[in-house]
């Protein structure tokens, strides 16, 4: 397993981690299998989405802010919206590996989704296969 450290600089942001996932795949030597990317935090997640236009991640964050506003929640730490956003994006993704490459679509990238930053974070990449 590969463990990556990440520092986020905003309260909410999507960080493109595709290069780190590709790096883990290269180091693993796996040609055919699956790459699992996992976030061990309850206020951050992992997703796959467009990486060609940075406005897409800005739009996604804007929509998440609209549908999950900062209101009074029972959870008193003040980060309930971050927990709910993580529920929507998820904590992991699985990406097929074919001929030593991530089987991502032409415009796809892997993102670490920060909803309660800035913070020091980690994410894990596990490559399985042959």
Could you say what each language-model-derived stretch is?
Residues 1-130:
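Active-site histidine-anchored catalytic micro-motif
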């Amino acid at each position: 397993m590969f463990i990556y450290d990440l520092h986020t600089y905003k309260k909410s942001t999507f960080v493109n981690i595709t290069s780190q996932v590709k790096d883990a795949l290269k180091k693993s030597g796996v040609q055919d299998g699956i790459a699992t990317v996992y976030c061990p935090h309850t206020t951050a997640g992992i997703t796959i989405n467009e990486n060609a236009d940075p406005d897409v991640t800005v739009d996604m964050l804007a929509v998440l802010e609209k549908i999950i506003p900062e209101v009074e929640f029972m959870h008193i730490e003040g980060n309930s919206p971050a927990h709910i956003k993580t529920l929507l994006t998820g904590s992991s993704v699985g990406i097929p590996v074919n001929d030593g490459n991530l089987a991502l679509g032409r415009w796809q990238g892997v993102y670490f989704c920060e909803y309660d930053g800035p913070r020091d974070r980690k994410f894990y990449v596990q490559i399985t296969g042959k």
